[in-house]
Structures are given as structure tokens and as C-alpha cells.
């Protein structure tokens, strides 16, 4: 059914466009078996590494066969409009600026859902796929968080900081907004999130109906992100793409973050299992907040006063249940999670914007306690940023799926 809907969307789009074009004006239409769109939101502190990744993509494109690699690039160059192009056989081809694709702005905000929608629709229209589509989200991410812990501004994916490459104080795109954009394009075979903290149950559940698989890290990733010379060919493997991306993410000699692959069709079952196990934990704990001591956490939001545990967030979902549920309940929940997390690679440490020995020495990563995904656990609102977080989580579908009696 998804394939039929995709074909209808493409044919309708092509019909509308052809009707609006002058008869003597030809559009570039290049079919591929798979089309992968790389959305580079680099108008921020990552601007300096965009060129390196583009060069890696060019090298990797020599091995992609009859497929389309399309890249949209927005970086902090005042003299350069954001542009979209196809990368083929080591070369950038068919390059167009945002003005050419209908975005009439001098300083384009790539975190604006309307901009992303326009870019993706252009890419699908000009580079349609015979088989399926993939999307790479390149940039910053703060998991499911929809507001900053220091100022009220939209967050979650992307960040557009104007022409400033020295900070990350601009606009972000929320995960619900991302979901709404992606629901307007053909169903995706996968989303590869090359950005920090993306593999949280909250975001995965929000995006469960727009892609078959989601690949990324529950933790921070290195500034350079994936090694695209090796990852680009993996993106186009017919059935083994997900595990290949995990295995080729960084060269063997580099520090690689923990990574995971989630099959989104299992997310409803994970939500159901989580609802059941949380209900039991709540009954046991009554009105107290759970002790998170020793549980894997993938970020700490405190940037001023050194390490304070009340600022930890993005706790490993399974490690939390190992600590706070009965062995039988945990085992039953894990069976549901294992059907969703179809691949994962562990790391005992990873690159971070914090001092590892200060912020992450309070837990030990092992194959047993690493589960590949994080989950929000409400904490005392008088501590850290949890007064805000405990309210923000209510904006997401995951919260209402696992807390059926708290729909306010």
C-alpha cells in the first residue's frame, strides 16, 4: 500500500509540474533504484566540517550503482545561497540554489518546516526512485527536547544560526514538525540520523509512520559525524544497509559512538510493553521519583557548574528497567524492545562536549546494560531542568501512549 501511495504522489507531482512549465523548458528528471537525500543543516557550529563530508560523499558516490544521491547544503557562507545537487561518480551535478527551487529568501532558515518540505518535494520530483527512499539528517540534535534548558527556543533537530558559525543559538525543528514534513513525501525506507541523541523512544515513536527503519545514536556523536566515503555505498545496499551503516560509521581506529537500528513497525508494541512495566513501577514507588544512580545516561544539560547528577538526561531505557523492575517484568519488556532494536553496536566511551571523566564516570557500559535507545524518566521538578522537562514531554505522542491516564 505504501508503494502505491508513493507512486501516486510522484505521478501527481510530475503532472502538476509539467502543466505549469513552458513547453520549451525541460526539467531534469533522473530515476534511480533508490534515492537518498542528505539534508545538511550546517548553518551553525558544524559549518566548518561540511566541506570535508561533501568530499567524502563524492568519493563514496563512485560505488552507488544505479541510484540517486541528492544533497541539500546550508552552511554559514554569506556569499553562498543554500544549494541542492546530485552527487554522481565523484562529481557534483545538476546543482541549483534555493532560489531555483522556489525558496525566495536571502537568508534561508533550513530549520523551517516549510523550507525542508520544499527541498524534499523538489528532490523527490527530480530524482524519483523506482524502489524506495532514504533520508540522512545531518546536523545537530537534542533528541526529543522541544525547548532549550537555558532559553525558550525551538529545538530537537537541525539548528539554523544565520551566518554565524560560532554558536548554536538559532532556530531548531521540533520532532513533531519533522514528522509532519516527512508525512508529505513518499514513505521512507530509512532515516539515518547523523546527529546527537536522536535514538530516544520519544522521537522514534513520533516518526514510526514515516520510515521503516531509523538509524542513529542515543549519545553524542563526533563533530565529523559519519565517514561518508564508506557510509555512502552502505546507504544503497538493498537489504543490508542498516547494519552496514553501523559497521562503517567510523574507521576502526576512531572512537565510535554507540549506535542502533530500530524497526519502527515494532514501536507500538514497545509502547504497550513500556506502559505495562511503568504501571508496575509506579505502584511500587507510589509518589516518589526513581533513584537514577549508576544508570547509563547519554547527556548532561549543565554547562555552568560542573557535574551535577540532577542535570543528567537521556537515560538508557533498558538500564532503567533493569534497576527498577522485577527480573520477569524486565525480561518481558526486553523481548518487545529486541524486536524493535534489530541492530546495535556498543561503545564504552564516546566523544562529548563535556569532560568524560567528570560527567560520565558514574556508570559502566556493558553489552548487558546497553540497549541502544534512551527514554525520558521524570525527576524531581525542583532539581536541574526537570520542572521544564516534565512538562515538555507531554507534547509528544509517546508520553500519552505510555501514560494513558495522564492526558492533560
Write out the residue ranges for each language-model feature:
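Bacterial Sec-dependent N-terminal signal peptides
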Residues: 1, 14-36, 377-379
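Acidic/polar, low-complexity intrinsically disordered N-terminal segments immediately downstream
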Residues: 24-68, 72-75
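Terminal, contiguous helix-loop blocks that mediate binding/assembly
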Residues: 29, 121, 125-127, 150-408
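Phosphate/oxyanion-binding active-site loops and adjacent basic polyanion-contact surfaces
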Residues: 46-50, 108-116, 167-178
